[in-house]
Amino acid sequence: GSGKTTLMRLITGQLRAQQGQVLVEGKDVAAFSAAELYEHRRRMGVLFQHGALFTDLSVFDNVAFPMRELTRLPEAVIRDLVILKLNAVGLRGVEKLMPSELSGGMARRVALARTIALDPEIMLYDEPFTGLDPISLGVIAHLISRINNALRSTSVMVSHDIEQSLAIVNQVIFLAHGEVVFSGSPEEMRQLDSPWVHQFVHGEPNGPVAFRYPAATTLQQDLLG
Protein backbone atom coordinates (compact mmCIF):
# COMPACT_ATOMS: atom_id res chain seq x y z
CA GLY A 1 0.00 0.00 0.00
CA SER A 2 2.96 2.37 -0.30
CA GLY A 3 2.34 3.26 -3.94
CA LYS A 4 4.73 0.93 -5.78
CA THR A 5 2.33 -0.28 -8.46
CA THR A 6 0.85 3.21 -8.72
CA LEU A 7 4.35 4.48 -9.50
CA MET A 8 4.64 1.97 -12.33
CA ARG A 9 1.29 3.10 -13.72
CA LEU A 10 2.61 6.67 -13.67
CA ILE A 11 5.63 5.54 -15.69
CA THR A 12 3.41 3.88 -18.31
CA GLY A 13 1.10 6.89 -18.46
CA GLN A 14 -1.95 5.02 -17.19
CA LEU A 15 -2.20 7.56 -14.38
CA ARG A 16 -1.30 11.25 -14.27
CA ALA A 17 0.60 12.62 -11.29
CA GLN A 18 -1.26 15.20 -9.20
CA GLN A 19 2.09 16.67 -8.21
CA GLY A 20 5.61 16.35 -9.58
CA GLN A 21 6.74 14.79 -12.85
CA VAL A 22 7.71 11.43 -14.28
CA LEU A 23 10.50 12.10 -16.77
CA VAL A 24 11.66 9.61 -19.40
CA GLU A 25 14.69 10.87 -21.32
CA GLY A 26 13.87 14.33 -20.01
CA LYS A 27 10.27 14.30 -21.23
CA ASP A 28 7.24 14.50 -18.92
CA VAL A 29 5.06 11.42 -19.47
CA ALA A 30 1.94 13.32 -18.37
CA ALA A 31 2.47 15.83 -21.21
CA PHE A 32 2.62 13.21 -23.97
CA SER A 33 0.12 13.39 -26.80
CA ALA A 34 -1.81 10.22 -27.66
CA ALA A 35 0.71 9.42 -30.41
CA GLU A 36 3.68 10.07 -28.12
CA LEU A 37 2.16 7.93 -25.36
CA TYR A 38 1.61 5.08 -27.84
CA GLU A 39 5.25 5.25 -28.94
CA HIS A 40 6.37 5.50 -25.29
CA ARG A 41 4.49 2.31 -24.40
CA ARG A 42 5.72 0.58 -27.54
CA ARG A 43 9.27 0.92 -26.23
CA MET A 44 8.28 -0.77 -22.97
CA GLY A 45 7.94 -4.33 -21.81
CA VAL A 46 5.84 -5.10 -18.72
CA LEU A 47 5.94 -8.36 -16.79
CA PHE A 48 2.75 -8.43 -14.76
CA GLN A 49 2.55 -9.93 -11.28
CA HIS A 50 0.88 -13.17 -12.35
CA GLY A 51 2.04 -13.25 -15.97
CA ALA A 52 -1.36 -12.31 -17.45
CA LEU A 53 -1.16 -14.79 -20.32
CA PHE A 54 -4.13 -15.00 -22.67
CA THR A 55 -5.70 -18.27 -21.56
CA ASP A 56 -7.38 -18.96 -24.92
CA LEU A 57 -4.13 -18.55 -26.90
CA SER A 58 -1.29 -21.04 -27.22
CA VAL A 59 2.18 -20.26 -25.93
CA PHE A 60 3.25 -19.42 -29.48
CA ASP A 61 0.36 -17.01 -30.02
CA ASN A 62 0.91 -15.37 -26.62
CA VAL A 63 4.53 -14.55 -27.45
CA ALA A 64 3.64 -13.55 -31.02
CA PHE A 65 0.81 -11.26 -29.89
CA PRO A 66 2.79 -7.99 -29.53
CA MET A 67 4.63 -8.67 -32.79
CA ARG A 68 1.36 -9.09 -34.67
CA GLU A 69 -0.31 -6.13 -32.99
CA LEU A 70 2.52 -3.60 -33.12
CA THR A 71 4.57 -4.51 -36.20
CA ARG A 72 4.08 -5.49 -39.83
CA LEU A 73 6.55 -8.34 -39.72
CA PRO A 74 5.78 -11.30 -42.00
CA GLU A 75 4.56 -14.43 -40.26
CA ALA A 76 7.73 -16.34 -41.15
CA VAL A 77 9.85 -13.77 -39.30
CA ILE A 78 7.45 -13.77 -36.33
CA ARG A 79 7.76 -17.56 -36.14
CA ASP A 80 11.55 -17.37 -35.93
CA LEU A 81 11.44 -14.57 -33.35
CA VAL A 82 8.99 -16.48 -31.14
CA ILE A 83 11.29 -19.50 -31.17
CA LEU A 84 14.27 -17.28 -30.29
CA LYS A 85 12.42 -15.59 -27.41
CA LEU A 86 11.26 -18.92 -25.98
CA ASN A 87 14.78 -20.27 -26.32
CA ALA A 88 16.05 -17.25 -24.38
CA VAL A 89 13.91 -18.27 -21.38
CA GLY A 90 14.68 -21.97 -21.76
CA LEU A 91 11.29 -23.03 -23.10
CA ARG A 92 11.83 -23.79 -26.78
CA GLY A 93 9.55 -26.72 -27.57
CA VAL A 94 6.45 -25.62 -25.64
CA GLU A 95 5.05 -23.48 -28.47
CA LYS A 96 1.91 -25.59 -28.95
CA LEU A 97 0.98 -25.87 -25.27
CA MET A 98 -1.84 -23.86 -23.71
CA PRO A 99 -1.32 -21.79 -20.54
CA SER A 100 -3.39 -24.30 -18.56
CA GLU A 101 -0.78 -26.95 -19.36
CA LEU A 102 2.09 -24.95 -17.85
CA SER A 103 3.39 -24.86 -14.30
CA GLY A 104 3.43 -21.51 -12.53
CA GLY A 105 7.13 -21.04 -13.15
CA MET A 106 6.82 -21.96 -16.83
CA ALA A 107 3.90 -19.56 -17.28
CA ARG A 108 5.96 -16.73 -15.79
CA ARG A 109 8.81 -17.53 -18.19
CA VAL A 110 6.44 -17.51 -21.17
CA ALA A 111 5.16 -14.13 -19.99
CA LEU A 112 8.77 -12.93 -19.82
CA ALA A 113 9.36 -14.14 -23.39
CA ARG A 114 6.32 -12.12 -24.48
CA THR A 115 7.60 -9.11 -22.54
CA ILE A 116 10.88 -9.09 -24.50
CA ALA A 117 9.21 -9.83 -27.85
CA LEU A 118 10.03 -6.38 -29.26
CA ASP A 119 13.39 -5.90 -27.47
CA PRO A 120 12.08 -3.10 -25.22
CA GLU A 121 14.28 -0.24 -24.06
CA ILE A 122 12.44 -0.04 -20.72
CA MET A 123 11.42 -3.09 -18.69
CA LEU A 124 8.90 -2.95 -15.85
CA TYR A 125 8.58 -5.90 -13.46
CA ASP A 126 5.58 -5.91 -11.10
CA GLU A 127 6.28 -8.42 -8.30
CA PRO A 128 8.00 -10.92 -10.64
CA PHE A 129 8.76 -13.42 -7.85
CA THR A 130 5.26 -13.67 -6.34
CA GLY A 131 3.90 -17.20 -5.91
CA LEU A 132 6.97 -19.02 -7.25
CA ASP A 133 8.71 -22.02 -5.71
CA PRO A 134 12.41 -21.55 -4.83
CA ILE A 135 13.69 -23.09 -8.07
CA SER A 136 11.37 -21.06 -10.31
CA LEU A 137 12.16 -17.94 -8.29
CA GLY A 138 15.88 -18.45 -8.86
CA VAL A 139 15.32 -19.06 -12.57
CA ILE A 140 13.27 -15.88 -13.01
CA ALA A 141 15.84 -13.81 -11.09
CA HIS A 142 18.61 -15.22 -13.29
CA LEU A 143 16.64 -14.50 -16.47
CA ILE A 144 15.80 -10.94 -15.42
CA SER A 145 19.47 -10.21 -14.78
CA ARG A 146 20.66 -11.88 -17.99
CA ILE A 147 18.00 -10.28 -20.20
CA ASN A 148 18.65 -6.84 -18.72
CA ASN A 149 22.34 -7.17 -19.55
CA ALA A 150 21.63 -8.53 -23.05
CA LEU A 151 19.13 -5.80 -23.97
CA ARG A 152 21.02 -3.07 -22.08
CA SER A 153 17.60 -1.81 -21.06
CA THR A 154 16.50 0.34 -18.16
CA SER A 155 14.61 -1.90 -15.74
CA VAL A 156 12.30 -0.98 -12.87
CA MET A 157 11.29 -3.80 -10.54
CA VAL A 158 8.70 -3.70 -7.78
CA SER A 159 9.33 -6.50 -5.29
CA HIS A 160 9.10 -7.57 -1.66
CA ASP A 161 11.73 -10.28 -2.15
CA ILE A 162 14.78 -8.68 -0.57
CA GLU A 163 17.32 -11.44 -1.14
CA GLN A 164 16.71 -11.88 -4.86
CA SER A 165 16.18 -8.18 -5.54
CA LEU A 166 19.37 -6.97 -3.87
CA ALA A 167 21.35 -9.62 -5.75
CA ILE A 168 20.43 -8.28 -9.20
CA VAL A 169 19.66 -4.55 -8.92
CA ASN A 170 22.01 -1.57 -9.12
CA GLN A 171 19.88 0.90 -7.19
CA VAL A 172 17.20 0.52 -4.54
CA ILE A 173 14.37 2.93 -3.79
CA PHE A 174 12.58 2.06 -0.54
CA LEU A 175 9.01 3.33 -0.21
CA ALA A 176 7.01 3.62 3.00
CA HIS A 177 3.65 5.38 3.30
CA GLY A 178 4.06 6.82 -0.18
CA GLU A 179 7.41 8.43 0.58
CA VAL A 180 10.99 7.57 -0.37
CA VAL A 181 12.80 6.67 2.86
CA PHE A 182 15.96 5.43 1.14
CA SER A 183 17.61 5.62 -2.28
CA GLY A 184 21.01 4.10 -2.97
CA SER A 185 22.96 0.94 -3.71
CA PRO A 186 22.10 -2.49 -2.26
CA GLU A 187 25.23 -2.34 -0.10
CA GLU A 188 24.26 1.08 1.27
CA MET A 189 20.80 -0.26 2.06
CA ARG A 190 22.21 -3.18 4.03
CA GLN A 191 24.29 -0.80 6.16
CA LEU A 192 21.59 1.84 6.66
CA ASP A 193 20.59 2.61 10.24
CA SER A 194 16.88 3.04 9.58
CA PRO A 195 14.13 1.32 11.62
CA TRP A 196 11.93 1.06 8.52
CA VAL A 197 14.62 -0.55 6.37
CA HIS A 198 15.93 -2.75 9.20
CA GLN A 199 12.49 -4.20 9.92
CA PHE A 200 11.82 -4.87 6.24
CA VAL A 201 15.21 -6.40 5.42
CA HIS A 202 15.22 -8.66 8.48
CA GLY A 203 11.51 -9.52 8.45
CA GLU A 204 10.95 -8.44 12.04
CA PRO A 205 7.33 -8.76 13.25
CA ASN A 206 7.31 -5.49 15.16
CA GLY A 207 8.78 -2.07 14.52
CA PRO A 208 7.62 1.01 12.59
CA VAL A 209 5.08 -1.35 11.04
CA ALA A 210 3.40 -2.43 14.26
CA PHE A 211 2.35 -6.02 14.92
CA ARG A 212 -0.88 -4.93 16.62
CA TYR A 213 -3.57 -2.91 14.92
CA PRO A 214 -4.19 0.37 16.83
CA ALA A 215 -7.62 -0.51 18.26
CA ALA A 216 -9.67 2.35 19.67
CA THR A 217 -10.33 0.45 22.92
CA THR A 218 -8.26 -1.73 25.24
CA LEU A 219 -8.61 -5.52 25.35
CA GLN A 220 -10.06 -5.22 28.87
CA GLN A 221 -12.71 -2.77 27.68
CA ASP A 222 -13.72 -5.09 24.85
CA LEU A 223 -13.97 -8.12 27.14
CA LEU A 224 -15.92 -6.30 29.85
CA GLY A 225 -18.24 -4.66 27.35
Indicate where each model-derived feature is located.
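Catalytic Walker B motif of ABC-type/P-loop ATPase nucleotide-binding domains
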Residues: 123-126
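ABC ATPase NBD coupling module
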Residues: 29-45, 75, 189-192
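Helix-to-loop junction immediately C-terminal to a conserved catalytic motif
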Residues: 12
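Conserved ABC ATPase signature
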Residues: 98-102, 106
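Conserved catalytic motifs of ABC-family nucleotide-binding domains
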Residues: 119
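Conserved ABC ATPase "signature" region
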Residues: 27-28, 75-93
